[in-house]
Amino acid sequence: MIRSSIVILSLLLISHLVSAKVLLIGNSTSLSFDDVEATFTPMIKRSDQGGVLYVAEPLDACSDLVNTVNVKNGTTVSPPYVLIIRGGCSFEDKIRNAQKAGYKAAIVYDYEDFGFLVSMAGNPSGVLIYGTFVSKATGEVLKEYAGRTDFEVWLMPSFETSAWSIMAISFISLLAMSAVLATCFFVRRHRVRRRRILALNGNDFHRMPKSMIIRMPTTIFNGICDEATTSILCCICLENYEKGDKLRILPCHHKFHVACVDLWLGQRKSFCPVCKRDARSISTDKPPSEHTPFLSRTPSMTPTSSFLLSSSSTTPLQSSHELPISIRVDPSLPSTSMQPHTVPMYLSHSRSHTSFQNGSNRFSRPIPVSRSSADLRNAVSQRSYNSPHQVSLPRFLHSRYTHILGPGNASRSQVVGLLTSQREHSLHQNDSRRSFIHFASASSLPGW
């Protein structure tokens, strides 16, 4: 719709720009006719003089004209205009023959009344006279006054046309600017909308530049596999690593062939093919393995009481505020003294235990006590504790309670009571007493 409107306005603009007026002025007579200027002749810019009109011989002016400039009483009637009929040859031939005969302007009229005027076209090279096209009716009227020296023909430029042309040009310019602005607006809106959709879908991963990829660390595979999931084969090409292969390490600590991962990051997406982590991020975290804790040290975690089931050798504590706890099963006790779903437990120090620390945020899950005593008795190696010295106590407990109990005189109930009171004090400081409800008193340890 917009394109068709622009084309129509352009045609109207062209037709108005080349249009002019033919005036026939004589004794008390003035006639005006519409005409269209030729496109290959000089444009009529002013009307400072007129000329006498003559009829061409031959009328179609397809050959050299017989009648040239008329000479009367030794004076030259100047400038003469010639009237030519359409047809027989091209407009360019008619205009050139009229120019050769010495005429200043050529007026071509139509041989049929089509109702509209046409614009004459041709090669403008060497054409110096004016040329206009009029209708059949205008040509017949002008033919009646041809050869009369008391009547002159004037070719007038249309000043009204200039105003129309200015308005048309302004309107077309405004329309074009509006179309360009609307196109830019809709294109920008589409791009913003597409970016939002990609961001919501989580697909806002772009390709990484080669400079960032080269800065990532690399390593040489020596045949030793670590705990990482990508330490055996490349998850991109699915080929096992061979000794001497060059591997690239991503920020998530996953490893791949250098050629494979460089092609992936440079031409596909900027995330890890395994864990989908953005490779553009920087991380100093160690890769997860069997030696790293299950729970990371984050401020969002709440303190939780924890103790681990372990059978490793005991080592001294690092701080006087730590109270390690481990759970052991005494297989030497008779099975008749055990209640269903209860397990007799001892307290000993283990190197792999997590200590209770004031203000610490790193804890493990509590171990449930409701387990079968038979299963635990079969899983744990048999050990017997015949004296209170075999109860693995921390150094600060030995130094604190030796002068009270005395070596060799402490009973199990006394040791458990002292340890229970100390444990309750530590649990109160760590705000996790609820998790140790089964160990709040010595009565919860059967068989002691």
UniProtKB/Swiss-Prot annotation:
Residues 298-315 have a biased composition (Low complexity). Residues 281-315 are annotated as: Disordered. GO terms for molecular function: zinc ion binding. Residues 21-165 are lumenal. One of its GO terms (biological process) is protein transport. It is a single-pass type I membrane protein. The gene is RMR4. It comes from Arabidopsis thaliana. It is found in: Prevacuolar compartment membrane; Protein storage vacuole membrane. One of its GO terms (cellular component) is protein storage vacuole membrane. Residues 187-448 are cytoplasmic. Involved in the trafficking of vacuolar proteins. May function as a sorting receptor for protein trafficking to the protein storage vacuole (PSV). This is Receptor homology region, transmembrane domain- and RING domain-containing protein 4. Glycans are attached at residues 27, 73. InterPro entries: E3_ligase_sorting_rcpt (IPR051653), PA_dom_sf (IPR046450), PA_domain (IPR003137), Znf_RING (IPR001841), Znf_RING/FYVE/PHD (IPR013083), ZNRF4/RNF13/RNF167_PA (IPR044744). Keywords: Disulfide bond, Glycoprotein, Membrane, Metal-binding, Protein transport, Signal, Transmembrane, Transmembrane helix, Transport, Vacuole, Zinc, Zinc-finger. Disulfide bonds join 62-89.
